[in-house]
């Protein structure tokens, strides 16, 4: 899945640059500029649909990649793993600020709700939120800085990816048995390149199908309404890939408690290398750990479902 993530990143950066060329980061023009892109720019509709659904595939790939890392004990490459977790956090931040840019109803209210969570931090919270907003509510300054961040962060991700790969190449990659695989080394080309082409095709076909046939399947219909600070949508919820975390946030009645649980649900990944006690690296021959692992997967799926 690492290769697929790299391809996702390249696709997102290319489509994103093309979109940025036509986008206007201003509250009065953002929504109209996105509509203009889809109507009047050559293949603008396709570029936008690929960019919006490409994000979903990026998250599908990264969740599968993390799941596989957990299953096969890849987290014992501590540096690689920790940079991977930082990559996940950066990706989540990028997706969040990007979601705000079209300036639809859910963009605006999502930004309001999530940035407002920082006010739960004791003592400095309120100041922090007003500093992030650039005022007393989500408004033009917020949109402008979110666009700046959304442009910058993917290049940070690309840089971190190189560091991630550098550390991975220190140890070499893991295998399903979790044992040294020096004796099994084979040339990258044609073997791995062929295997990667299969994964590439299996990702590209659903992505293009989704972008061409039902581009709005995963989006929120509220985003077809321009942002209105005076009308709150009936259900404020993020894109599907954040629903598990959002469900955790919403299920805790205390604001600070919810924020801490939300943060912990992702940051727990940093602790995984410290929690490994087994003599075997991988879960291949550990049925008990397998049960726990698949319970975790089911748990995340249920949270995602409940969150929606």
UniProtKB/Swiss-Prot annotation:
Query: What SUPFAM superfamilies does the record point to?
Result: a domain/subunit of cytochrome bc1 complex (Ubiquinol-cytochrome c reductase), Transmembrane di-heme cytochromes
CDD domains reported for this sequence: cytochrome_b_C, Cytochrome_b_N
Q: Which GO terms describe its molecular function?
A: metal ion binding; ubiquinol-cytochrome-c reductase activity
UniProtKB keywords = Electron transport, Heme, Iron, Membrane, Metal-binding, Mitochondrion, Mitochondrion inner membrane, Respiratory chain, Transmembrane, Transmembrane helix, Transport, Ubiquinone
The cofactor named in the record is:
heme b
Instruction: Quote the record's binding site residues for heme b b566.
Output: 65, 164
Q: Which GO terms describe its cellular component?
A: mitochondrial inner membrane
- Explain how, and how many, cofactor molecules are bound: Binds 2 heme b groups non-covalently.
Query: Where do the TM regions start and end?
Result: 1-21, 45-66, 81-101, 146-166, 194-214, 256-276, 288-308
| Role noted for this protein | Component of the ubiquinol-cytochrome c reductase complex (complex III or cytochrome b-c1 complex) that is part of the mitochondrial respiratory chain. The b-c1 complex mediates electron transfer from ubiquinol to cytochrome c. Contributes to the generation of a proton gradient across the mitochondrial membrane that is then used for ATP synthesis.
Whom does it interact with, and what assembly results? The cytochrome bc1 complex contains 11 subunits: 3 respiratory subunits (MT-CYB, CYC1 and UQCRFS1), 2 core proteins (UQCRC1 and UQCRC2) and 6 low-molecular weight proteins (UQCRH/QCR6, UQCRB/QCR7, UQCRQ/QCR8, UQCR10/QCR9, UQCR11/QCR10 and a cleavage product of UQCRFS1). This cytochrome bc1 complex then forms a dimer.
Q: Any extra detail in the entry?
A: Heme 1 (or BL or b562) is low-potential and absorbs at about 562 nm, and heme 2 (or BH or b566) is high-potential and absorbs at about 566 nm.
Protein name, per record: Cytochrome b
Organism from which the protein derives: Pomatostomus temporalis (Grey-crowned babbler)
């Amino acid at each position: 899945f690492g290769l697929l993530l790299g391809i996702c990143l390249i696709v997102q950066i290319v489509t994103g640059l093309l979109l940025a060329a036509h986008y206007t980061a201003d509250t009065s023009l953002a929504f109209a500029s996105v509509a203009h892109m889809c109507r009047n720019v050559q293949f603008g509709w396709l570029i936008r649909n690929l960019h919006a659904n490409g994000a979903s595939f990026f998250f599908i790939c990264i969740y599968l990649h993390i799941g596989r890392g957990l299953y096969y004990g890849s987290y014992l490459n501590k540096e690689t793993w920790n940079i991977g977790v930082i990559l996940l956090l950066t990706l989540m931040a990028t997706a969040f600020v990007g979601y705000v840019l079209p300036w639809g109803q859910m963009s605006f209210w999502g930004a309001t709700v999530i940035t407002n969570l920082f006010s739960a931090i004791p003592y400095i919270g309120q100041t922090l939120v007003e500093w992030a907003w650039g005022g007393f509510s989500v408004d033009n300054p917020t949109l402008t800085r979110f666009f700046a961040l959304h442009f910058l962060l993917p290049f940070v991700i690309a840089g971190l990816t190189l560091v991630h790969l550098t550390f991975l190449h220190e140890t070499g990659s893991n295998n399903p048995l979790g044992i040294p695989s020096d004796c099994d080394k084979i040339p990258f080309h044609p073997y791995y390149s062929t295997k990667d082409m299969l994964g590439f095709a299996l990702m590209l076909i659903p992505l293009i199908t989704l972008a061409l046939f039902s581009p709005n399947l995963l989006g929120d219909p509220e985003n077809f309404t321009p942002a209105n600070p005076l009308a709150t949508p009936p259900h404020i919820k993020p894109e599907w890939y954040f629903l598990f975390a959002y469900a955790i946030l919403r299920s805790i009645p205390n604001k600070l408690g919810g924020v801490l649980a939300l943060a912990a649900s992702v940051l727990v990944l940093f602790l995984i290398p410290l929690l490994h006690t087994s003599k075997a690296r991988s879960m291949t021959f550990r049925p008990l750990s397998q049960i726990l692992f698949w319970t975790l997967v089911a748990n995340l799926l249920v949270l995602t479902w409940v969150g929606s």
